[in-house]
Amino acid sequence: PVQQPAALRELISIQPGRVVSMALSRSEHCQMTLLAFGDGESISEERYFGDTVYYVLEGDMPLRLEGHEVRLGAGDCLAVPAQTTHAIGGPWPSGLVWG
């Protein structure tokens, strides 16, 4: 959304059996992606060069962070430091902003 404000939940929809993504920003200074997870979908363990912030728009989102699980709900936000191994996704449909 560049010209006018937009409700993030209306930009992307949860689809069964898929992880759907939409880039909101991909500049060298800021990368932000909107993600929608179908039931049981996830993104495997990763390490990113910069800090990563997750904000859950809807549903519940388990985040596995260096061996332990944190459950984020709608409205929750969590920052993961750079080079920290983590994975996101779980058995429920959910949507989040990642950047």
Predicted stretch roles:
Residues 36-38, 47-63:
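Short, conserved beta-strand element in jelly-roll/cupin
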Residues 82-99:
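Ligand-binding loop in jelly-roll beta-barrel domains
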